[in-house]
Amino acid sequence: YKIDMAEGDDDVLREAIQSCQAARQVFDKYAHPIRWSEIMNTLAQILQVYGDNVRSVPVLQHSVRSCVAALHVRTPDTAPLQWAAIQNTLGSALFLLAKHTGEWEYMRQSSEAFRAALTVYGEHGAGRMATVTERNLIRSERQMKDASDKQTVDPIWAQSFNITDTDDVFDWDAFLDGDSGDDDSDVSQVA
């Protein structure tokens, strides 16, 4: 399913989701916690691709919930590299949620998850995974920076400029044509 995930074949992705759901029934969280957490992480990855393809926020939210559930089983103390992998998956799911909702708090949380994974990968010499996660973190932080750069900050002069209800009666066309509309003007016309 990895190639199909990259290509985004929705039918294959739906089959993969169903397979993961069936596997969760066989590998119970309490009887087979390690296998169950692997299934949950795989499910989260598939849900990310599918949710992004069909632009479904609820599917992406299920991806996040799958990661969080897996993180209750895999901890940094008991399975650090697997925990970091789930953190990376969580970061990706949160990144996509931010992309599809415009809620940049998800992007901040995404960066936190990537940083947590990167720390563990660094401590355990997992260079290849650290490289992947570092690229994810850079992309997440770039998106946050771009979003903050796009926020409009009014110039100083605009902060004191107030439009009021009485401004709708102002003759903007006359103003733009050079007529101030002010008959009591002290300015004399030069002929």
Model-found features: residue ranges?
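Short coil/turn connectors between adjacent alpha-helices in alpha-solenoid helical repeat scaffolds
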Residues: 1-15, 48-61, 96-109, 143-152
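Conserved alpha-helical positions within TPR/SEL1-like repeat arrays
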Residues: 1-5, 34-49, 81-96, 128-142
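Short coil/turn linkers that connect adjacent helices within long alpha-helical scaffolds
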Residues: 6-7, 29-32, 53, 73-79, ...
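Amphipathic alpha-helical segments of tetratricopeptide repeats
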Residues: 20-28, 64-73, 112-120
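Boundary/linker segments of alpha-helical solenoid repeat arrays
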Residues: 31-32, 78-79, 118-119, 123-133, ...
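Alpha-helical adaptor scaffolds
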Residues: 34, 45, 49, 53-82
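TPR/TPR-like (Sel1-like) alpha-helical repeat modules
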Residues: 65, 104-125, 138, 151-162
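Terminal, low-structured helical/coil segments at or just beyond the last alpha-helical repeat
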Residues: 129-191
